[in-house]
From Swiss-Prot:
GO terms for molecular function: carbohydrate binding; chitin binding. The lineage of its organism: Eukaryota, Metazoa, Chordata, Craniata, Vertebrata. It comes from Oncorhynchus mykiss. Multimeric. This is Ladderlectin. InterPro entries: C-type_lectin-like, C-type_lectin-like/link_sf, C-type_lectin/snaclec_domain, CTDL_fold.
Length: 190
């Protein structure tokens, strides 16, 4: 019920002031983390909201960008590394929804880009290319299935469920959602 209320409030806010869903999601994400903090901390957080390079979107302490150019997973990850980034790792439902919105804002829909998950070393032992803990999963029903023993990489927004699918890394999909850490500069309240 709370998520429905929040969704309705976000939709109403978009309609009333023309804010993008990404901006509202960033505000919502910050509000969750601020909780009972004082007014001074809220002002500092608001000042620190947009610390990503142009074309990147901030969620927490990371910046995300969508690249539509189709590549295999290894070439997509190599492209990310050349930009000082990695294919995205996903650590919560809220973060996954944010990534879906980043993709939708660039494509007008739900394309199926790569993210940084892979199990090429051992089947069903998943890792993120950025080395972070694989602590969240959002698989489509029946996945991961490692069809044909050759599906060690992950795409998002798969078919009608818009969840994850394990797939052959050599397939060509949009290069993916890229991420990089951002160093949050905290301004001391005066």
């Amino acid at each position: 019920m709370a998520m429905l209320t929040i969704s309705l409030l976000l939709c109403a806010a978009v309609a009333l002031n023309g804010a993008t869903v990404l901006e509202l999601f960033q505000d919502f994400e910050q509000a969750l983390h601020l909780g009972a903090k004082g007014e001074d901390e809220r002002v500092v957080a608001a000042e620190n909201r947009n610390q990503c390079p142009t074309g990147w979107f901030q969620f927490g302490s990371r910046c995300f960008m969508f690249v539509e150019t189709a590549r295999s997973w290894p070439l997509a990850e190599r492209h990310c590394v050349s930009l000082g980034a990695n294919l995205a790792s996903v650590h919560s439902s809220a973060e996954y929804q944010f990534l879906q919105e980043v993709v939708a804002s660039k494509t007008g829909g739900f394309s199926t880009p790569w993210i940084g998950g892979f199990d090429a070393v051992q089947d069903r032992l998943w890792f993120w290319s950025d080395g972070s803990e694989f602590d969240y999963q959002n698989w489509k029903k029946g996945e991961p299935n490692n069809s044909g023993g050759r599906e060690p990489c992950i795409v998002i927004n798969w078919r009608d469920e818009y969840r994850w699918n394990d797939i052959n890394c050599g397939n060509s999909f949009p290069s993916g959602v890229l991420q990089k850490n951002v160093e949050i500069q905290k301004n001391e309240p005066t």
